[in-house]
Amino acid sequence: RGEPGIVFELKTADRKRDLNARVDEAFAQIRDRGYYEGMEGRVILVGMAFWKKVPCVRIGSA
């Protein structure tokens, strides 16, 4: 079993109000491109977007 796998996708936003849309795009990219395929066991998916130093994070599982 071991530790879970973790997949990150990072995006930047030009405006603070775009953070939620960009984090959704990051998360969708992980799923659409199947970055977690072939990983065994539990896989944690992390979409992150940044505007300057302000983060927005979405976490899910495969």
Q: What are these model-derived regions, one by one?
A:
Residues 1:
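Active-site beta-strand termini and strand-to-loop segments that position acidic
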Residues 23-24, 34-59:
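Nucleic-acid nuclease catalytic cores
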Residues 16-29:
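Active-site-adjacent loop/helix micro-motif of nuclease/hydrolase catalytic cores
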Residues 4-16, 33:
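Conserved catalytic cores of phosphodiester-cleaving nucleases, focusing on short active-site segments
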Residues 14-18, 53-56:
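Flexible loop/turn segments at secondary-structure boundaries
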